[in-house]
Structure formats: structure tokens, C-alpha cells
């Protein structure tokens, strides 16, 4: 687990390119590490079957079958589709030590992972809706 985002990414864009692609909330969350307010994101209470993907690069991140209601106001999942698609980064902001999760392909801030999730992993990936897109299962 690293403490900085210094690794090369598959998808690299300028700030202007990210701003043109993303809406203002998506940009602040994914590129500056902001957090949307609890219970306001479009996927907080979304239960359709399918795959949630990175809004920045479309990398598939979470299957709807791993989503659960954590009662926290953000979409929560107990595991990513593939462990290697998520980077874990030590986050020491706001006087806390947490584990930030980012998209490995484009470096988008997704949210944080906590050790209080359900079986089988015991982890809770607490993810901002603004960092996600969704593809329904066919």
C-alpha cells in the first residue's frame, strides 16, 4: 500500500480533459478526493443487477452481487471484481488514518475501505456514487 499516487496509469489525461469529461461533482470526487454528502448519490439506494465501473475510464470495479446496505449513505461493496483493479493508499487527511481506494487504471479517487464489512471478506468498500457509472446486466 502506497501513501502517494506516483505510479504510472493506463489512462492519463490533462486536468482540462478531465474537466471536459466529468461533471463538477465527478471531477471534485475523482480528481481531488472530495466526498459527496451521505444519502445524496444516485447509487446509494440502487439495487439493479449489473456492474459498477469507473466514471473516469470505464474500468469494471464492482458487481452488484457484492453490494450491501451498510446504512452509511454511500454505496458499499464487500469486494471488487478483481483485487488488482483497486489501489489502496494510506490517507492521513482530516486527522485520521484511513485506507483510500483508487481506480488502478486512471487513479480516480473512489472512496475508502474499512475492516467492518460482511463475510466473506470482512471489508466494506465505501464508494462515492460520483466516481461510478453502471452497466445493467443483460
Swiss-Prot record:
One GO location term (cellular component): cytoplasm
Reactions listed under catalytic activity: L-methionyl-[protein] + [thioredoxin]-disulfide + H2O = L-methionyl-(R)-S-oxide-[protein] + [thioredoxin]-dithiol
Zinc listed as a keyword: yes
Cofactor note: Binds 1 zinc ion per subunit. The zinc ion is important for the structural integrity of the protein.
Enzyme Commission designation: 1.8.4.12
InterPro entries from the UniProt entry: Met_Sox_Rdtase_MsrB, Met_Sox_Rdtase_MsrB_dom, Mss4-like_sf
Name recorded for this polypeptide: Peptide methionine sulfoxide reductase MsrB
Classification lineage: Bacteria, Pseudomonadati, Pseudomonadota, Betaproteobacteria, Burkholderiales
Protein's gene: msrB
Amino acid at each position: 500500500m502506497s501513501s502517494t499516487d506516483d505510479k504510472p496509469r493506463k489512462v492519463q489525461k490533462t486536468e482540462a480533459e478531465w474537466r471536459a469529461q466529468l461533471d463538477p461533482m465527478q471531477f471534485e470526487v475523482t480528481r481531488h478526493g472530495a466526498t459527496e454528502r451521505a444519502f445524496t448519490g444516485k447509487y446509494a439506494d440502487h439495487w439493479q443487477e449489473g456492474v459498477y465501473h469507473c466514471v473516469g475510464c470505464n474500468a469494471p470495479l464492482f458487481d452488484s452481487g457484492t453490494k450491501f446496505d451498510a446504512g452509511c449513505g454511500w454505496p458499499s461493496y464487500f469486494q471488487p471484481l478483481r483485487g488488482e483493479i483497486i489501489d489502496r493508499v494510506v490517507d492521513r487527511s482530516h486527522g485520521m488514518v484511513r485506507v483510500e481506494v483508487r481506480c488502478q487504471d486512471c487513479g480516480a479517487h473512489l472512496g475508502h475501505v474499512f475492516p467492518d464489512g460482511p463475510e466473506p471478506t470482512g471489508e466494506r468498500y465505501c464508494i462515492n456514487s460520483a466516481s461510478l457509472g453502471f452497466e445493467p446486466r443483460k
